[in-house]
Amino acid sequence: MEFRYDFSDYKKSDFDPKAQAERVLISVHADSDVNEDKEVARKRLGYALKEVERQITDLIVHEETTLTKNVSSSLNAQSYLQDIEGKLEQLMLVYERIRSLVVIPSENLGPLHEAIVNLHSTYMTLYWLGEFFGIQAKLFPLFQGSINENEKLSRYYQASLLLQESDQLLSRFPLMKRQSSVSLLLKLNITNRSRIIKETSSYLLSQEDQLSFSVNSNGFTNACSVLYMLDKYLLEQDLTRLLSSRIQKAIIQFDSIFQLSPTTRRLLHNSTDPSAANSTIWSKFEDGWYQISKIGAQCVFWERSLQKANICNPDYPNLLEYFQMQPNFILDGATICIYFFKELAISISSKMQMLDRRDPILLRVFRSDFQRVTHIVEQAIARSSSEIVNKDTRECSIVMNSLRVLAPKNP
């Protein structure tokens, strides 16, 4: 007689060892009430159980080979390998105990049922240990070799995905942590995780003064994705610092427009022909907004980089929308560009009101040609986004509203 025990569903959450045991008994007609049939069934069941034992042995040999290969490819330390081999020997002993439990039942399913349950539990542990070491085999090479910044961030992104996968695996099967080899690898993972977080955060903060960026660079996207996976709070801190720094720099740049040299101010106030002073003032205004446009371009780059990061799927379409939805994050539902120009506009409005009281002669220069003011501001905002914008663009409306004090006053 030939019986084939079905191991195909050992990974499924609805695996039913009792049903498997019943299937064995039914296959040998052990449910008959006739004594003669019971004797025949016992003999048939004996053959069936021997076949199950043979299949158990085959599984052990196959999984031991697979697991050892995984470990050999991922670990160089001989002590690790010896430890794994010791664990495999222990598993073999467990299987021997299971085999000894597989006895021919006379009246009930108890011994066979218990044996199959133990078989399932042990085999699950063996299988997921193999999966865990397979993850480690992919993880270790990502920290080796000298590479450039973008390639390193790409590797850190892959490593973060694997660390997440490892965490999920251990949360589903926490008993694996009792294996000393797993504990050693977890300590190494903690070290690598800290390294990734530290270096990725340093990269993000280094972008604070980076005004040249490649259109094809995924470094910023990968860095944000990595911190989203490993430390969301630190990612929020870093982005808050970056945006606050850019806003402060833009405010300082705008304030510098109205810081006139003594010569220019003397020409503006005392000269019968203030054209020279006016020319200098307009030049400072144009240059100031050009510098602001470069800062705005950086915000646009960050915004688009976050839009490309879809690591937060399916909860959010991309990281930009994730941050927009966070109740305690500075964006408060706005895009990065809108937030940048809104904060800048608040400072501009305050500055304009102060100058209107203290330096009306300086503002008279801009009031004389408000159309030129509008053109310079709109072009600066357009330049920051590399898109054609008009007076209906929200960013333009926000900024121009803060400059309304420069508009000619109706008589």
Curated annotation (Swiss-Prot):
One of its GO terms (biological process) is intracellular protein transport. Its main location: cytoplasm. It comes from the Eukaryota. It is found in: Cytoplasm; Golgi apparatus membrane. Disulfide bonds: none annotated. InterPro entries: Cog5, COG5_helical, COG5_N. The keyword Manganese does not apply. One of its GO terms (cellular component) is cytosol. Pfam families: COG5_C, COG5_N. It is a peripheral membrane protein. Belongs to the COG5 family. Component of the conserved oligomeric Golgi (COG) complex which consists of eight different proteins cog1-cog8. Acts as essential component of the peripheral membrane COG complex that is involved in intra-Golgi protein trafficking. COG is located at the cis-Golgi, and regulates tethering of retrograde intra-Golgi vesicles and possibly a number of other membrane trafficking events. This is Conserved oligomeric Golgi complex subunit 5. It comes from Schizosaccharomyces pombe (strain 972 / ATCC 24843). The gene is cog5.
